[in-house]
Amino acid sequence: MNPSTAQARVVVDELVRGGVRDVVLCPGSRNAPLAFALQAADAAGRLRLHMRIDERTAGFLAIGLAISAGAPVPVVMTSGTAVANLGPAVLEANYARVPLIVLSANRPYEMLGTGANQTVEQLGLFGSQVRATISLGLAEADGAGAGSYDQQNSVWRSAVCRVLAAARGTRSGNAGPVHFDIPLREPLVPDLAEGEAEPAGRAGGAPWTATQYATLDVPLEIDLTPDTVVVSGHGAGLRPELAHLPTVAEPTAPMHGPALHPLALPLLTPRQAIITGRPTLHRQVSRLLADPAVTVYALTTGPRWPDVSGNVVGTGTRAVTSGGPRPEWLAHCRELDEKARQVVRAELAGHPKPTGLHVAAVVMDALREGDQLLLGASNPVRDAALVATPRPGVRVLSNRGVAGIDGTVSTAVGAALAHPGRTIALIGDLTFLHDAAGLLIGRGEPRPADLTIVVANDDGGGIFELLEQGDPQYAGVFERVFGTPHGMDLAALCAAYRIPHRQVDPAELAAELAGDAHGLRVLEVITERSSLRELHATVRAKIAP
């Protein structure tokens, strides 16, 4: 068995022993030993292999698989620009704490700087964005026969266990991406006549090095007598000790206590706020947390805590509470929450044309227990937060790490592949077009059993209508440089990828979502964005006393 083949087989075997069940592979020559080993493991039913020709979409497919399954997912590619294309996915995985493993093949290191083709300084390419950068030395035969790699076997397997531990955050409490770079020397294909087994792992299929999850327990004493609100942000865990407190929860975060609509927040004067997770959505929340008159606490599970304004007075992993909220405070919050929700729905009912908010309302109303919902990082996740709270038993995902629109279609496909039930993705047209390559799934590759991608198509960037750039005084330049209309025919685009497509209105969308997709399909709703600014202003005005 040649050295590169032996090393690749050991790496793949140890990944499986370490709990890896899905791997995304991009074709190439330098990573051929890994490709052969992965194909063999897939054929043996030890893992599920997903082939993709575009490394950028492959990275986000791996993110979708990882966040839905809650397990590390390697994405394997050849050397050169193939590795650089993982940059956006690595950034997202870093800030969203997703166990993404970038397993890159490399040229032998002595080839660096020689002008050799497709050879770049890729070790360390991701810098501070990864939890660890780990490399294996070149595989070399120790001798002849079955024991020719015994000395290196332990080093290879130990390195894989370090990669998995760093990705899971077992010792740090901080899961995230890892770069695992393996230089491979020719020959890059297995010997046709070889019958030799790879160096063995531990008995019973156990990992070479077992790692236990470290537990971080930092109690934080909080008196709940002052009027308090909870802000539940992305990545938060459920906090039973906060179950009776009004909670502004992002769609991807747990609702710890009674729901509090984000648009009701400016009408309240809380004396303290408790952050769980990382808030990423609402300006009303940002203003509250920046108010020096509000005492702010942060509860997180990892080493980081959010504190954009510098107002946090204490951090911990759980709250040790004393006192309790005033009944009058709870009643006031409940009344404002109900009013905000009624106003939003009433204004949508009276609006003459469908907007992204209308589409979000239909999608949120159609969810049922066991569903998985993926929201685009632009307007869809914000629209969902305004129209409803997710139903119990519905898991909500969104790429909120750096909140880019990159790879959202691929993330949805990956999430659906890892979920046994129905998955619905709600995204905008620009997000859909930005990752249209995510629809490219090769013949014979695993495909989602039940994924509906709902595209709210307002022919451009509707979110900018609601930001400073959308002020009427900038109307002369807005449409071209912020609105960015494209006029694309999404039906034709889907047809090119052989994906079923149907254009529907909101009522038809509701009927479609009453059933299952039976595969992957796209439902497009034509919406308009020119009235979004006025609609949001009207809602805010009618909520105010």
Curated annotation (Swiss-Prot):
CDD domains: TPP_PYR_MenD, TPP_SHCHC_synthase
Gene3D superfamilies linked to this entry: 3.40.50.970, TPP-binding domain
Class of enzymatic activity (EC top level): transferase
The protein's annotated pathway: Quinol/quinone metabolism; 1,4-dihydroxy-2-naphthoate biosynthesis; 1,4-dihydroxy-2-naphthoate from chorismate: step 2/7; Quinol/quinone metabolism; menaquinone biosynthesis
Entry keyword Magnesium: yes
Any GO molecular function: thiamine pyrophosphate binding
Biological process per Gene Ontology, one example term: menaquinone biosynthetic process
Keyword 4Fe-4S: no
PANTHER family per UniProt: 2-SUCCINYL-5-ENOLPYRUVYL-6-HYDROXY-3-CYCLOHEXENE-1-CARBOXYLATE SYNTHASE, PROTEIN PHYLLO, CHLOROPLASTIC
NCBIfam families, alphabetized: menD (TIGR00173)
Subunit structure, interactors included: Homodimer.
Functional summary from the UniProt entry: Catalyzes the thiamine diphosphate-dependent decarboxylation of 2-oxoglutarate and the subsequent addition of the resulting succinic semialdehyde-thiamine pyrophosphate anion to isochorismate to yield 2-succinyl-5-enolpyruvyl-6-hydroxy-3-cyclohexene-1-carboxylate (SEPHCHC).
Listed name of the protein: 2-succinyl-5-enolpyruvyl-6-hydroxy-3-cyclohexene-1-carboxylate synthase
Gene: menD
